């Protein structure tokens, strides 16, 4: 029996080896490394899919996109009905990646966390990302720390019922934005 073909970006492979002592090094060394700068088409026989490097939540983000029916597997770039974890995020890239995934035609989005999303849900998520950016900019202008701003932060109207796994996520998100904005 043949083994499955493993595809991954170089960043993903390196991260797996670096962060996981039990990583299956034999499999990782045999994995086909896909281009991190441009989409890769994978022919599945009766259809194909596109693997698109996205970067944002982490440097190794990808989306997997199918055209008929229109489906986008978003990974951790999208947390539907949940406040995202910005632990390794570069916020401007996260926002850009999510906007670029959004399609003009009706699409089912499969997030890394939360229920399936449609265009309206993606719009709410983008609004949330923008809201966090705005709160971060205001906090910087006021000379606040990320922790102070995180304590003060509230979800936008209409999203109050979104799940928050960790109350520290607000400060983490604002801190990620502050780091990026101060480095600019």
Model feature map: region roles:
Residues 1-41:
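Active-site HxH/HxHxD metal-binding segment of metal-dependent hydrolases
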Residues 2-3, 30, 45-47, 67-69:
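Short coil/turn connectors at secondary-structure junctions
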Residues 11, 56-58, 183-184:
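Amphipathic, soluble alpha/beta structural segments
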Residues 20-21, 80, 85, 166:
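Detector for Asparagine
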Residues 20-37, 61-71, 109, 160-164:
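Short, charge-rich amphipathic segments
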Residues 41, 48-138:
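Metallo-beta-lactamase
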């Amino acid at each position: 029996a043949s083994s499955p073909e493993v595809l991954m970006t170089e960043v993903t492979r390196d991260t797996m080896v670096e962060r996981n002592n039990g990583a299956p090094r034999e499999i990782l060394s045999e994995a086909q490394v896909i281009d991190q700068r441009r989409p890769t088409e994978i022919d599945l026989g009766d259809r194909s899919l596109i693997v698109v490097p996205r970067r944002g939540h982490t440097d190794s983000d990808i989306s997997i996109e199918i055209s008929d029916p229109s489906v986008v597997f978003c990974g951790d770039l999208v947390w539907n009905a949940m406040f995202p974890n910005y632990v390794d995020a570069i916020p401007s890239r996260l926002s850009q990646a999510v906007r670029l995934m959004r399609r003009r035609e009706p699409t089912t989005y499969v997030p890394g966390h939360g229920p399936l999303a449609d265009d309206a849900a993606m719009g709410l998520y983008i609004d949330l990302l923008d809201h966090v950016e705005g709160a971060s900019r205001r906090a910087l202008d006021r000379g606040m720390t990320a922790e102070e701003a995180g304590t003060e932060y509230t979800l936008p109207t209409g999203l109050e019922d979104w799940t928050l796994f960790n109350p520290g996520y607000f400060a983490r998100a604002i801190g990620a934005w502050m780091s990026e904005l101060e480095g600019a």
